[in-house]
């Protein structure tokens, strides 16, 4: 997990004095974490030569949209929403119950953000520009104990939404209207694992891939599931785990490609009291 971070740190020290103890070192290398602040459950995409990221905002209304040229240095460019128009938020009675584990996607010329709150269900919004304006939040489904949604649009035009159940999984996939404003069925369970959550859906060639964390925040690992059918059955491989480092529970993040064909993984590490800081792995 942290071999690359360690190597970049040593490379930075060998070439010039370390600028900071984290992030961009000013000489073409970086040291994890790249964001030494509370950005839990990051999801990121590339659009053209720019990268965009969102993260959970448990108790600070707005959900930040971040932009980067290099996956290391990030700038705040907008707030995805200003308020959740439900009574408990108006009365300051929903601490830590805001937006959990959002998904960010670019489809049909628009940026799409989906998220759940633990007791209010599924919300979504869109914008044609990452700087906004963002459409008012649409409350897709009022339901308890959903988490970690991710939309996916297949080549045949069918849209889907993957999600899990608060605290323990499993992974469930629904058919969804193409505009993202309605779920079309009750969903099908496609995978059950230990605290399976954080679903991110991709398709490469003829295979559907689900990238999920398992095992819980403190001691978990990252799993990739693969199938030729979005409903499975899925084959499974653990692709990232703690190993012998102090970087506990590599957890819940996003796979993103670069214009020249490299692949990188952004994930969080719980590091209290700071919160959940963001790491970047090749």
Model-derived segments and spans:
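Bacterial Sec-dependent N-terminal signal peptides
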Residues: 1-16
């Amino acid at each position: 997990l942290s071999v690359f971070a360690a190597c970049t740190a040593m490379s930075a020290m060998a070439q010039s004095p370390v600028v900071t103890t984290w992030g961009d070192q000013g000489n073409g290398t970086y040291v994890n974490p790249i964001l030494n602040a509370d950005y839990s459950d990051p999801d990121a995409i590339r659009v053209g030569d720019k990268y965009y990221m969102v993260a959970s905002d448990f108790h600070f209304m707005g959900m930040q949209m971040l932009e980067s040229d290099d996956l290391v240095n990030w700038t705040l460019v907008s707030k995805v929403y200003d308020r959740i128009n439900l009574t408990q938020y108006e009365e300051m009675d929903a601490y830590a119950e805001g937006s959990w584990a959002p998904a960010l996607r670019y489809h049909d010329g628009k940026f799409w953000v989906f998220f759940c709150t633990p007791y209010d269900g599924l919300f979504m919004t869109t914008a044609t520009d990452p700087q906004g304006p963002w459409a008012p939040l649409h409350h897709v489904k009022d339901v308890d104990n959903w988490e970690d949604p991710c939309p996916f649009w297949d080549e045949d035009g069918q849209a889907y939404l993957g999600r899990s159940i608060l605290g323990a999984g499993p992974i469930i996939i629904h058919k969804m209207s193409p505009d993202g404003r309605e779920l079309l069925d009750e969903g099908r369970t496609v995978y059950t694992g230990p605290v399976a959550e954080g679903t991110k859906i991709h398709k490469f060639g003829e295979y559907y891939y689900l990238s999920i964390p398992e095992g819980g925040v403190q001691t978990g690992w990252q799993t990739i599931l693969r199938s030729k059918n979005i409903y499975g059955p899925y084959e499974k491989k653990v692709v990232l785990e703690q190993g012998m480092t102090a970087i506990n529970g590599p957890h819940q993040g996003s796979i993103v490609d670069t214009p020249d064909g490299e692949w990188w993984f952004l994930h969080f590490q719980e590091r209290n009291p700071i919160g959940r800081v963001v790491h970047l792995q090749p």
